[in-house]
Amino acid sequence: MIIGIDVGGTHTDGVLLGINSPNGEGYEILATSKVRTQKDNLMKSILEVLDVLLAAAQVPDIKRIVLSTTLAANVIVEENYDPVGLVLIPGPGLNPEHLLIGDENILLSGYINHRGIEVRDLEQEELLKGLERIKARGIKNLAIVSKFSTRNPGLEAEVLQLIREKDYPFENISLGHQLSGRLGFPRRLVTAYFNTAIMSVYRDFVQAVEKALEERELDTGVFVLKCDGGTVPLDRVMEAPIETVNSGPAASIMGTMAMTGVYQNKETAIALDIGGTTTDIGLFIKGEPAFMPEGIELNGFPTLVRGLYSLSLPLGGDSKIAVKDGKLKIGPERDGPAAAFGGPSPTPTDALLVLDYIQDDPDYEGRADLQAAREALVALAGDLDPTEYGRCWQDGKLDLTEFASFIIDKMLASIVETIQEILASLENKPVYTISELLAGVEIRPQLLLTMGGPASALSPLLAEKLGYREEVVPYAKVANAVGAALARPTLQTTVRVDTAASYLHIVEAGIHRQLKAGEDYDLEEVEELAMAWTRKRADDETAVVEISERESFNVIRGFRTIGKIMEVRAQIKPGLISRPEGSEN
């Protein structure tokens, strides 16, 4: 049996899947659970989900647990993450002014050239002054990024060593070279910045999961979904939490692929997961998820994190509705649950309840205080500019139904506009899916696939505005947890060969040795070695393996090439292990 859990900003969802075929390849959904996420007590939320699922299973039968979460993505979208100081070593030839995205920034004078040679050492006094400035502001998080650090991490390591020697009180530190082997200084510093910004959120998440599993004596393989739809063991997440920052949106996309016929029918479609805090937008092209091999974007900044194409709009069922300067504003903040459930602010969920769109939903029926929802909207309307919102008044009195309808129309318009902007941005550009590069392909979706709490209410309204067919994903309220559960277990192998130093590293296998006499490699052979070791470590010679990163450069001494340094990362290709019974074929 497999458990999938998605920890969202509003709800924590869970599913229990069991094998339903003699060959062990088919799965069925045995139990589901959905509870409110308690951000100040994540362990309790996870335990509540586990207890419902374990009521339908025996602990020894659980062979794998896969988690996803939108917690980190939400704090980035809401710009509610911890402040981060940036230590940048950009070298010459680059104006760094547009790169100063830290809450405090240090620009250092040392640099590494494109061959990996340290041309200029750091100036310690310059560094110490900058660190003191960051410390004085009470910033506890630091990202250290040097240009060409993948070819020589020495300057980044030197900064870290000084921080430790001087006992600076930084709690979370990221080094740029540890997060990706690919070049791209601007993308690397953004990656390191956000990696540091979400460390405390992820640490709380990992600790809550570990404690919950210990409480229920679950001793099994535990994984977290990555941005690319692959998985990483829970105990390795903190090495690079940025790799899982979009695990929530990835789970939604994998769940859509698992529970609908989009892949089998080779449909071009928009996938929506309308949550309480955000709406996650994904894209399928001819049945396959769109992919960003160069790196996803976070708040408009490009990173080096490979991932499924998605965009998180800070707009959900529990987004705070407010009036500013007489104008209605929805999100990006979320104050808590809807007013109908005791929350402090009106939300789109309150508007849906007033319109009777979700009154019969089992998750709301009997629990929602409709009067509280109405009162919250009425109180809000008093601050509106009547000249701009005239449709909401009849004979000088507020038409509450019309006002609630206006709120939902505004929410839908934001989602539709974002979808249209996404499609416009991809016009006349090469687009990748998880399998191939597509050039000259027109992206004209005709299908809208929705999941999330209000999916059944909003899907037909959105489809009408877009001119698409629409389909609510089966098990829409927990389909993201299904996507996490059914994600193919992946592992990766990093092989680094330094022919100048005559050394071979197969990192995850723990092999670090001198090259043997006559042993030599070119880049293609290093790739073959990485793929072979990935299959060996997975104990599956038929596993589909892909190269996720490759890097090769000459080692120069005395104006002469004396060897090469090559680094390759291979991984089992992300995908689904099965499609569950009850999905659309």
Annotate each PLM feature.
Residues 1-585:
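N-terminally biased helix-coil "hinge/interface" segments that flank
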